[in-house]
């Protein structure tokens, strides 16, 4: 029996129908369509809740109810896990004094900074519920824009941008790819865990053996490789792999975050002028690499100014000192200012200049390596195989073992030549008989895509 509550009050005690299942997906849904009958009419409201299979589920939509005969009321309640609360909270930017600003905005930082802002927004609406961060991937710096997203949408944006996944367990939010080996071997046979198995490609995208690959249009010499306007990998703007095996399958890919750059670090700031700072190790004179009629700019990667771009007013290579203009795009919040300013240790890169050949070559090599990784992933059959599995309920009833989303299991099917480890990316569990499972096994959920990385050259 399932007890449905509103606050501390019991609204109804119901017996779920045999077909009711718990549905979970990696970086996705966690819901139950709770169907049941009552001999009387009961009104249910949004955010009524119930404890089901050890988790709290909330009614998020007006329920469906029908009446058959004089006394039989049939209900279906769409209930979601704790993550539904994130969909109620706008993902807003905040400043150092706790003021929140409307979208759009962007941040340039590591995953932990984004997740800290996410948590602050959740606590803004649900201040005393014990929400906290769990594991957060140790990431590169990313520049990510947000426009009218709630916290659940923002969490999915972060998972995609940092090439990882999100997981909410109770009221703890994780941003990482869970890799928990269970030791369970799924195979068919008397007393084994597997009842039926279907193997299929995760998507129908073609392999690629010739990839036309491009980077950003920033910081390129003029002319560049016969008039090309974007970074590429050589005189021929493509990479070939496995053509002898598969023939020619062409595609193209652009990595906008890869371009010739040097990551500078502030070593001192002028105490009398927050617009002036020094990088004692800056390696080249940018005044010799300016583009006619184009203002050189710099973008902060870390620190209070992370994500902001500034025109360079002047540069003195003798002292390796930069002077920048204020960023006045937001008239209500011009930067730098007394609260948000450059500090020693902040990192930045200069753009809208022409970098020397050495930096261009390094960027081309980084682009080539990224393209090879992309092609290898596209062409690896094991990356694209997915398995739909119906589990043997008698096995799980006898052993007491449970399956959890994102856990890894081994699939063994000798006749099909299958012996591989895969993760549970979708999981369906019967509520009345929790030893009945069906699941989908793959390396990654379908919606996870390759994203661009910022390269330090």
Predicted features and spans:
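Short beta-strand-centered interaction patches in the first periplasmic/extracellular domains
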Residues: 63-86, 129-220, 299-306, 318-330, ...
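Surface-exposed cap/loop segments at beta↔alpha junctions
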Residues: 41-130
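Acidic, small/polar-enriched beta strand-loop surface segments
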Residues: 184-378, 398-421
